[in-house]
């Protein structure tokens, strides 16, 4: 195939460069036929010669129309691509266009400024483009082909080189570039130099610039052709400007170029579309001239460098624009720069306009002559004679068919309000305003107002019968005014004007001065199909709302054959349907090349209709060069297939009228008729009851008796209603259920008093019905930072902005809050804020209070009930129901203890709930029972509100947790766990802080399959949650296999013997449901029994942890029972026993607190099972079953006292504890990530870092796949290796043979499982799941902690502590799943983005931390930690850990006694609040 040898014009130059440097090239076809022809020919050549881009691929070429807001399409495409594929390489985009395409581009350019987008814009010398509209969009702006003295060949080469530079700049700095060039024709230049184009590597870097660095590194290794990952820098504007300047300077690019003598005193700074013509004229006239080559970034120092030192006066030449300005933008740039630098050069401003290149010499001469005179500084001169109008985008000639038809139909009556051609008659109005549909609508409204005033003036003249006006004139005016709005009137306006001209009176002359109002004009606003992409930004919506007599003709140009290419994000709205839904507009869908008659009828009907009219006109074409045959073919295809239906619709505007819809599409009408005939026929055939005549089925007597019964029933209802008390509507908003439960109780009490009462959530109540209510009571809780609960937010948003009259309404509000929840003074506004806001809003809307605002406070002696018990009697008094005697047996609230007692050993109605396919949820009481089965019901809180708006129930899913003592997992078990997550979960595995697995997002229908697969590999979920002994945690002790074997045996024994014995687990999850049903019918012969737990199990959960000093990787003291192994010569002799550890608390409730276990004695290994059971029995019999917040073992120990509790345990045992024995001091509570280690049995182990325990595949790492494949190979090769899950949410690969190290190392390197190159801070971190699945979460945790650590790492690196371990943990609520209370730094979630910052925990889990600052957000956290970490780095002693230092430095005081009896709340600095 032949090869292109040269470039012949600038259009070909920029299109070639853009093609070579892009993945997607948008070609905006200009209306200029010469420009468009050259561009089209260039694109054909690129296709003909099979040109490739720098990456060796053929880019996509997408044509756009210049008058249809092309940059809106481009911005949507780029931003939609980034949103959909945020972790995938993006396309590099370029644009070739002319200045008309930038007409409405400014708002879109702002969005694209940080994209590597290059737009090459052709601008003719006579084109008055307003550069001010794009100068501050953030784009780099370059000019080419404008150097003084350049020949055509040199100008073409300059354009070619600058186009290449623009792409290199965009890709290198990840910034948008506008390249303006002056078109050059009929010359020749060599093809582009490949060395000047961006490299393949530059292009790839730009494609992945938005992807996180870790993923790019992985992609780099996969690609094999990129040596190192590269991230284009992200700058704010000053930094971007500096980087651009530096890059331009490295390429020897001059932002300004000077031509003239070295001792010139007067210099012209030429800028704009005609800069090249003016520069040439200046050089010819021996006038010194400087040219702007780089407008943005503005580099004033470079300007002063090129100016001669002899310069005294600088004249800035800028193009004229249609917008009135005193000072032009470039002049102001130069002025501010010179003033800032203290320059003494005088400045002058000149505006020019060029209608032909010959005028350039005249303008330069005029400027020189003016400068030789005595001008004052800053004088503005205009040289604009003969200047062409500012460019206004106009539709191509192919769309003139509808224009011509309008002129033919309406002749002199036609007024196309936004016709660009009319700009010549509106000299004082900017052209861009004239074509704006909003301006056009305003013009019509103003015209109609003036015409109405004109008609009133005529009517007044006829009424007063002015003697100076002739009788003939009055008769003519009388005939005209009678039919002024009648389109069929026989009165000809031209004849009226002709007759009035015979009258010379002053009133008639005044009317003739406004003779245009005699004609009943038909106003038309013409728009393109671009309107259909955003109906709110066009005049369509305003026209429909204003209901004025305005006609819209909207031309749709999209061919049927290209409809699939339209992205969903840019899908057109149906304008016709939109307009018809308003019900006040005439709507027609027409196609000139399909039905000429239908179009004529639609135009006439639209003109006749007294109101807004919308006529959709179909004119499909691919490019402006398409002929009528192409349009005809596309039209026929679209109309025949039904893509473009033809119809007309006239609405009914008055009572008694009927709307008239005419379907003009023959094919659709024919098919619809066939369908309706068949449907009607089948309907008649399928009537369930024969339709017989009434005379055969009814009698008059029967009708009378029926009416008597109806009247009697209505009379009885009225009588009963008269006897009842006042109506009452109770609304509630509650996240935790408190307000809802109180509302239900209030409803029962109101009903018992005779009130006609109804109850519902606030969001379920239609706001517009408030005005019809008599009495409304609202019970509302407080969420987050004084926010409404989720089921009350829509109600509040609606009433907050509603314009209601509630003068007939009486209301009462009671709020539930906690005065100490936000202890800082500035945060007190959040206390009971929803209740206060509602009360104030009801008053604003005119409602009268039934009772004063009630504010429940959890800090009161009886909590919220203290205030409520005073508020409710006042409510009954206001309703007149206070003296009503009632005898109501209010059932006590159902507690967890009631649910357990009635559950028949954890059965409840779970079995029936699983069979209910109408919902994805289980009953509330069953959800309490499924916890004992290891299952939590959750929903996706990220989409909860959206689903509620859609009328859907929450996206329910279930979390399942396995019971896996000591976290030991075989390869076979790992494969099964992975299969479950893939088949039925959310494709991730979660390692918990209790050394087991969790699965999220399991649907109700998949619960049985999931649990059956868990059981198949000899695991269970029973007892993994609920008020029983949970999974037993145990130190991993990988260095000593002998010790771990002993500890693992103890852990398994404790786990198995504390496992509930109920058969409900097997019955519900394992057995076949049909078998269970049959057995129930036959009658249950065997009854369950729980010898250890009893029918109500424990008051709360019971946790056991086993540690082997010196490692406390399980944070043993945080468990209800802490077992610390006493080891001699690799033999576990026994255990020191600790009791009363626990993490869960409630914010600002000092009755709740974290506590560390108290060591009470020592027992031998063979007796440890007896001891654990005895402790459990004492807790079972003495724990608080009334208040679940006070039910954990730690509260039982503190309530009874440690000595009393121990006595009770010893009483159960029948013997006493021995004295606690000494053991090696604990040295740390986190995992070891220092590569492979060898055990005493010559096996190997190493830790695998899993951040926050989330095993998943993402765009950065494929951990899930890597660990799955590792497990598969270990299982296939029957390896003895196993996995151990750690309590810090990581994985230990253990028991690896030496001959397996080779392939395991390769595999781990392949999936980056061996990557432990993280800071000590990150390696020691942990987080709970929190949002979006955990129902208790108040703030983010797992998803946020890595981001926060990244920012804290910057502080750590600054202090030189990157290798030092600082234990940092985060939870989304105060329940403490990640054990934050023993971390050196902890963030405990309190509200969205808000945390309590805790400091001072023990490095190895031996000490609780304490509140340092309450209710802080990210910025405050970083500001607080920065000085502390810097001080720690400078002041610490050898081996001193951060938690120890903050206590020694007096930052906080140490928590005494392990936190017993709430010691963690003591000694908190007032500054914390």
From Swiss-Prot:
PROSITE patterns: FLAVODOXIN_LIKE. It is found in: Cytoplasm. It comes from the Eukaryota. It is an enzyme of class 1 (oxidoreductase). The keyword Metal-binding applies. Its EC number is 1.8.1.2. Keywords: 4Fe-4S, Cytoplasm, Heme, Iron, Iron-sulfur, Metal-binding, NADP, Oxidoreductase. Pfam families: Flavodoxin_1 (PF00258), NIR_SIR (PF01077), NIR_SIR_ferr (PF03460). GO terms for biological process: hydrogen sulfide biosynthetic process; sulfate assimilation. Disulfide bonds: none annotated. Residues 728-876 form the Flavodoxin-like domain. GO terms for molecular function: 4 iron, 4 sulfur cluster binding; FMN binding; heme binding; metal ion binding; sulfite reductase (NADPH) activity. Pathway: Sulfur metabolism; hydrogen sulfide biosynthesis; hydrogen sulfide from sulfite (NADPH route): step 1/1. [4Fe-4S] cluster binds at residues 1328, 1334, 1373, 1377. Its main location: cytoplasm. Belongs to the nitrite and sulfite reductase 4Fe-4S domain family. Catalyzes the reduction of sulfite to sulfide, one of several activities required for the biosynthesis of L-cysteine from sulfate. This is Sulfite reductase [NADPH] subunit beta. It comes from Schizosaccharomyces pombe (strain 972 / ATCC 24843) (Fission yeast). The gene is sir1.
């Amino acid at each position: 195939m032949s090869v292109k040898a040269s470039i012949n014009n600038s259009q070909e130059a920029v299109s070639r460069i853009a093609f070579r440097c892009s993945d997607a090239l948008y070609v905006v076809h200009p209306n200029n036929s010469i420009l468009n022809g050259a561009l089209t020919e260039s694109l054909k050549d690129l296709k003909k010669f099979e040109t490739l881009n720098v990456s060796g691929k053929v880019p996509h070429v997408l044509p756009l129309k210049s008058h249809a807001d092309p940059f809106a399409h481009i911005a949507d495409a780029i931003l939609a691509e980034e949103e959909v594929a945020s972790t995938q390489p993006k396309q590099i985009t370029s644009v070739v266009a002319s200045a008309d395409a930038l007409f409405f581009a400014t708002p879109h350019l702002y969005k694209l400024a940080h994209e590597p987008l290059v737009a090459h814009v052709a601008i003719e010398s006579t084109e008055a483009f307003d550069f001010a509209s794009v100068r501050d969009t953030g784009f780099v702006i370059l000019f080419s082909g404008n150097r003084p003295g350049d020949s055509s060949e040199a100008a073409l080469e300059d354009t070619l080189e600058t186009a290449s530079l623009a792409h290199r700049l965009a890709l290198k700095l990840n910034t948008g570039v506008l390249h303006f060039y002056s078109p050059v024709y009929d010359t020749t230049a060599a093809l582009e130099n490949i060395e000047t184009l961006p490299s393949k590597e530059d292009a790839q870097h730009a494609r992945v610039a938005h992807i996180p660095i870790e993923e790019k590194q992985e992609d780099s290794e996969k690609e094999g052709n990129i040596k190192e990952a590269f991230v284009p820098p992200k700058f704010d504007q000053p930094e971007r400007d500096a980087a651009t300047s530096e890059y331009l300077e490295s390429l020897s690019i001059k932002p300004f170029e000077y031509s003239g003598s070295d001792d010139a005193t007067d210099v012209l700074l030429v800028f704009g579309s005609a800069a090249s013509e003016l520069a040439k004229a200046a050089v010819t006239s021996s006038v010194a001239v400087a040219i702007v080559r780089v407008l943005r970034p503005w580099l004033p120092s470079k300007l002063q460098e090129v100016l001669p030192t002899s310069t005294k006066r600088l004249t800035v030449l800028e193009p004229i624009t249609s917008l009135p300005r005193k000072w032009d933008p470039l002049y102001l740039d130069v002025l501010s720069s010179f003033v800032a630098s203290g320059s003494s050069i005088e400045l002058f401003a000149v505006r020019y306009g060029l209608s032909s290149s010959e005028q350039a010499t005249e303008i330069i001469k005029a400027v020189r002559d003016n400068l030789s005179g005595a001008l004052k500084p800053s004088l503005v001169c205009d040289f604009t004679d003969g200047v062409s109008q500012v460019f206004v985008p106009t539709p191509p000639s192919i769309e003139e068919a509808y224009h011509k038809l309008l002129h033919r139909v309406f002749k002199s009556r036609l007024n196309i309000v936004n016709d660009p051609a009319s700009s010549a008659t509106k000299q004082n109005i900017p052209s861009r305003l004239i074509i704006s549909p909003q301006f056009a609508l305003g013009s019509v409204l103003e015209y109609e107002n003036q015409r109405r005033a004109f008609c009133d003036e005529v009517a007044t003249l006829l009424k007063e019968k002015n003697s100076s006006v002739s009788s003939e004139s009055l008769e003519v005016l009388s005939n005209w005014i009678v039919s002024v709005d009648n389109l069929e009137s026989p009165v000809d306006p031209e004849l009226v004007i002709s007759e009035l001209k015979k009258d010379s009176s002053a009133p008639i002359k005044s009317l003739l001065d406004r003779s245009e109002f005699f004609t009943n004009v038909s106003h038309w606003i013409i728009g393109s199909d671009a309107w259909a992409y955003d109906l709110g930004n066009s005049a369509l919506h305003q026209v429909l709302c204003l209901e004025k007599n305005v006609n819209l003709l909207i031309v749709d140009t999209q061919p049927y054959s290209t409809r699939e290419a339209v992205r969903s994000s840019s899908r057109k709205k149906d304008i016709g349907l939109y307009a018809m839904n308003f019900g006040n507009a005439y709507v027609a869908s027409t196609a000139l090349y399909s039905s000429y008659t239908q179009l004529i009828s639609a135009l006439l009907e639209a003109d006749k209709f007294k109101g807004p009219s919308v006529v959709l006109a179909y004119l499909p074409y691919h490019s402006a060069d398409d002929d009528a045959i192409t349009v005809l073919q596309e039209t026929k295809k679209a109309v025949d297939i039904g893509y473009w239906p033809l119809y007309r619709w006239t609405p009914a505007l008055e009572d008694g009228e009927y709307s008239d819809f005419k379907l003009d599409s023959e094919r659709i009408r024919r098919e619809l008729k066939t369908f309706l005939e068949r449907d009607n026929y089948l309907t008649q055939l399928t009537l369930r009851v024969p339709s017989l005549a009434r005379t055969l089925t009814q009698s008059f007597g029967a009708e009378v008796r029926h009416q008597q019964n109806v009247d009697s029933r209505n009379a009885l209802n009225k009588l009963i209603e008269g006897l009842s008390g006042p109506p009452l509507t109770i609304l509630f908003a509650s996240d935790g259920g408190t307000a809802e439960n109180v509302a239900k109780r209030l409803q029962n009490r109101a009903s018992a008093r005779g009130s006609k009462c109804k109850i519902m959530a606030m969001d379920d109540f239609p706001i517009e019905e408030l005005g019809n209510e008599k009495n409304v009571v609202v019970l509302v809780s407080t969420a987050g930072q004084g926010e409404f609960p989720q089921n009350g937010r829509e109600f509040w948003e609606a009433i907050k902005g509603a314009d209601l009259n509630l003068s007939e309404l009486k209301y009462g509000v009671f709020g539930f809050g906690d005065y100490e929840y936000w202890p800082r003074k500035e945060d007190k506004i959040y206390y009971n804020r929803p209740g206060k806001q509602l009360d104030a809003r009801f008053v604003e809307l005119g409602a009268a209070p039934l009772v004063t605002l009630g504010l429940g406070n959890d800090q009161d002696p009886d909590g919220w009930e203290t205030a409520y018990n005073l508020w409710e009697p006042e409510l009954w008094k206001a309703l007149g129901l206070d003296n009503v005697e009632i005898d109501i047996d209010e059932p006590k609230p159902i507690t967890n203890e009631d649910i357990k007692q009635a559950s028949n050993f954890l059965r409840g109605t779970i079995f029936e709930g699983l069979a209910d396919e109408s919902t994805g949820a289980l009953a509330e009481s069953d959800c309490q029972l499924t916890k004992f089965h290891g299952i939590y019901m959750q929903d996706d809180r990220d989409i909860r509100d959206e689903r509620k708006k859609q009328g859907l129930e929450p996206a329910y899913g279930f979390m399942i947790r396995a019971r896996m003592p000591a976290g030991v997992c075989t390869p076979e078990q790992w494969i099964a766990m992975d299969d479950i997550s893939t088949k039925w979960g959310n494709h991730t595995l979660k390692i918990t802080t209790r050394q087991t697995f969790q699965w999220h997002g399991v649907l109700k229908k998949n619960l049985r399959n999931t649990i059956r697969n868990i059981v198949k590999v000899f695991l269970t979920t029973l007892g993994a949650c609920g008020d029983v002994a949970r999974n037993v945690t145990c130190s991993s002790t990988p260095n000593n296999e002998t010790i771990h074997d002993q500890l693992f045996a103890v852990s398994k024994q404790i786990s198995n013997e504390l496992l509930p014995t109920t058969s409900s687990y097997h019955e519900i999850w394992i057995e076949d449901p049909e078998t269970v049903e049959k057995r129930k019918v036959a009658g249950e012969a065997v009854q369950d029994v729980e010898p250890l737990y009893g029918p109500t199990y424990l008051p709360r959960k019971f946790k056991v942890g086993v540690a082997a000093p010196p490692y406390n990787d399980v944070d043993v003291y945080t468990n209800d029972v802490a077992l610390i192994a006493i080891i001699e010569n690799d033999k576990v002799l026994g255990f020191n026993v600790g009791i009363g550890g626990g993490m869960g608390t409630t914010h600002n409730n000092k009755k709740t607190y974290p506590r560390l276990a108290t060591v009470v004695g020592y027992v031998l290994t063979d007796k440890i099972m007896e001891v654990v059971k005895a402790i459990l029995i004492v807790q079972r019999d003495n724990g608080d079953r009334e208040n679940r917040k006070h039910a954990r073992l730690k509260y039982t120990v503190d309530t009874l006292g440690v000595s009393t509790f121990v006595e009770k345990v010893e009483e159960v045992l029948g013997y006493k504890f021995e004295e606690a024995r000494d053991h090696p001091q604990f040295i740390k509570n986190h995992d070891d990530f220092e590569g492979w280690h060898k055990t005493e049995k010559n096996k190997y182990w190493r830790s695998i870092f899993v951040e926050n325990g989330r095993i998943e595949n993402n765009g950065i790492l494929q951990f899930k796949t890597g660990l799955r494949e590792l497990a598969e190979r270990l299982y296939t090769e029957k390896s003895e290796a196993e996995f151990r899950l750690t309590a810090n949410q990581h994985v230990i690969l253990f028991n690896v043979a030496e001959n397996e190290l080779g392939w395991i190392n390769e595999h781990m390197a392949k999936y980056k499982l061996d990557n432990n190159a993280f800071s000590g801070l990150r390696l020691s971190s942990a987080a709970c799941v929190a949002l979006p699945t955990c129902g208790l979460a108040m703030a983010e945790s797992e998803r946020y902690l890595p981001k926060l650590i990244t920012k804290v790492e910057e502080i750590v690196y600054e202090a030189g502590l990157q290798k030092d371990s600082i234990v940092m943990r985060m939870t989304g609520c105060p329940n403490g799943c990640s054990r934050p209370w023993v971390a050196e730094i902890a963030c405990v979630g309190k509200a969205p983005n808000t945390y309590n910052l805790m400091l001072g925990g023990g490095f190895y889990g031996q000490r609780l931390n304490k509140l340092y600052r309450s209710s802080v957000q990210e910025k405050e956290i970083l500001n607080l930690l920065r000085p502390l970490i810097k001080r720690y780095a400078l002041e610490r002693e050898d081996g001193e850990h951060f938690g120890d230092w903050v206590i020694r430095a007096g930052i906080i005081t140490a928590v005494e006694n392990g936190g017993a009896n709430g010691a963690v709340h003591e000694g908190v600095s007032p500054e914390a609040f």
